[in-house]
Amino acid sequence: MALTELERKILRLHAEGLSDYRIAHKLNMEMPNVKRSRKNALKKIELAKADLEFADALKR
């Protein structure tokens, strides 16, 4: 699953060092929504990583 534009934006802002509170303020969002979007994005990244590792293992 691909990351949404919002998920990418939130991860980018976190990488720049902004807190959930600052991101929520900057994007005019509620803080629980920022946390949920970040959590969903990280889950998608972990699933994609696991898929790649599985595909790599099948090639061996």
Predicted regions and their residues:
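Hydrophobic positions on the alpha-helical face of helix-turn-helix-like DNA-binding modules
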Residues: I10, I23-H25, V34
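Helix-turn-helix DNA-binding motif, specifically the short coil turn and the N-cap/start of the second
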Residues: S19, N28-N33
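Short helix-to-turn junction characteristic of helix-turn-helix DNA-binding domains
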Residues: L13-L18
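Short helix-coil-helix linker/hinge
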Residues: M1-E7
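Short, basic, alpha-helical segments at the C-terminal edge of helix-turn-helix-like DNA-binding modules
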Residues: A50-R60
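Residues within the DNA-recognition helix of helix-turn-helix
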Residues: S37-N40, K44
